């Protein structure tokens, strides 16, 4: 009888775990598609001060982490963590690029000229200055999305099956590969081809660990 009860208990635990995995609508990370046509080097963007157009070709040979950012988001604390990632992975030829966007909860309402001041004195505040390049505010989804994000999204599966509440999402039309919220991340390899994509809630320390694991794997190939 005890063996039957123990077996039944194990089966119930297994089924509960399986159900939890099945019901979980997002993944912390996904690998991008194989055989992608094109590279990020075909695109570029203006720096946040509008003083320079940067062709992403200048990052050829580097690993690039593209991040859509916002100043008044619950995830804005990610900013200092991105500074740490940039500092610790710079010796490994990794560079972070940030793209302010106001499409998720209207959480980046300021002008380009106001964003850096807001980061320094409001959120995260405390004199914070990003040690990575920020670009002009723009769309990452919808009819007016930046072309580089069209390329990144079409190169990688979405990290979640679900979108947030429609009243907090400001673009049209919505597509399955769209970015779900602020602080999604895309890693691009030194050949300009997307490698990985992370869910916005994935901790930066996990992103950094995933990148290091990828770098170790590629260095031995």
Swiss-Prot record:
Task: Point out the gene that encodes the protein.
Answer: Gpx6
Name the enzyme group at the top EC level: oxidoreductase
UniProt subcellular location = Secreted
EC no.?
1.11.1.9
- SUPFAM superfamilies per UniProt: Thioredoxin-like
Q: How far does the signal peptide extend, from start to end residue?
A: 1-19
Give the keywords, sorted: Oxidoreductase, Peroxidase, Secreted, Signal
Name listed for the protein in its UniProt record: Glutathione peroxidase 6
Looking up Gene3D superfamilies in the UniProt record yields: Glutaredoxin
| Biological classification of the source | Eukaryota, Metazoa, Chordata, Craniata, Vertebrata
Q: What positions constitute the catalytic site? A: 73
What cellular component GO annotations does this protein have?
A: extracellular region
Organism whose genome encodes this protein: Mus musculus (Mouse)
